[in-house]
A protein has these predicted regions:
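Short, hydrophobic secondary-structure boundary micro-motifs
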Residues: 57, 110, 142-147, 156, ...
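Helix-turn-helix
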Residues: 39, 47-81, 85
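Generic hydrophobic, amphipathic alpha-helix propensity
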Residues: 36-44, 61, 86-90, 94-98, ...
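Hydrophobic alpha-helical connector segments
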Residues: 85, 99-141, 196-199
Length: 270
């Protein structure tokens, strides 16, 4: 090999090596940043779990993590941005859990229901009961979702883009169950989306009475009231009482055979 060719090859190899070093360093920085971001999210979730959504502030996080407030702002532009990310993670956890429930129960419904009408009605009852029980199993996630739906200020476009796709996905899964019940004649014709919104809002509202259950545990038994509300809603949507009784019995059996709210690892275990 002539000296010129050898020199050119050496320069090329050196350039490749330099690029590799730069890429490795960039990858390491990105991993470190992702790990740090996850650390902040876990800290935020702990605050929500211990003291509630209203206690989540950047200063509280900085105190808990022994870091400067400004450091947190390099990862999240505002408290709303941090809260939006927490809500996205929370909603996705609930959604994944619901998908696991559907994957477990759908084959059983097809095999054990008397017909497609009973299967669709049982699936609807299971889905609404799932929503009730997430308040117990995924308390923090449910509180974060409630904070999204009850906030007084308008969600900023950047936060909306961060959170709403996950919320719409969960909403769509619930609406599909309502629509299937309509399509099979299990409940009367109507707007499936409006019914799902009504159900979610009503269940969430009833569950709020748990906050005063210590005054009268029987009167303000939020979960029991919410489960009764599920039956009232489905009956109000036109379900035949005998059909509803059979579908509820099948839903009861399936709930006993596996978790009604399957476990999905959360950010606190990441």
């Amino acid at each position: 090999m002539c000296p010129t060719s050898h020199s050119r090859l050496t320069r090329t190899l050196n350039a490749i090596q330099t690029l590799n070093v730069v890429q490795v360093a960039a990858d390491r920085r990105e991993r470190n940043r992702a790990a740090r971001r996850s650390q902040y999210l876990r800290a935020a979730m702990r605050i929500v779990s211990d003291d509630g959504v209203e206690r989540l502030t950047m200063q509280r996080m900085a105190d808990d993590l022994d870091c400067a407030v400004g450091t947190i702002y390099t990862y999240f532009a505002s408290k709303d941005a941090l809260l939006a990310e927490l809500q996205r993670v929370a909603i996705e956890r609930i959604t994944d859990s619901y998908r696991l429930l559907v994957a477990r129960t759908d084959p059983e419904l097809e095999a054990r229901a008397r017909d497609e009408t009973e299967a669709a009605l049982s699936r609807l009852v299971l889905g609404l009961r799932f929503w009730v029980h997430t308040a117990d199993v995924y308390r923090d996630e449910s509180n974060l979702f409630r904070a999204l739906t009850t906030r007084r200020s308008r969600l900023a476009p950047t936060e909306a883009a961060q959170t709403l796709p996950a919320a719409w996905q969960l909403f769509a899964l619930g609406t599909t169950g309502v629509q299937a019940a309509i399509d099979t004649g299990a409940i009367s014709p109507g707007n499936a989306g409006e019914r799902m919104v009504t159900a979610a809002a009503a269940i969430g509202g009833v569950l709020l009475v748990e906050g005063i259950a210590h005054f009268d545990p029987e009167l303000f038994a939020g979960r029991s009231l919410a489960l009764q509300l599920v039956d009232d809603l489905v009956r109000g949507w036109g379900a035949d009482p005998d059909r509803l009784a059979a579908a509820s019995a099948l839903a009861d059996a399936l709930a006993l055979e596996g978790p009604l709210v399957p476990d999905v690892p959360g950010i606190d275990t990441a």
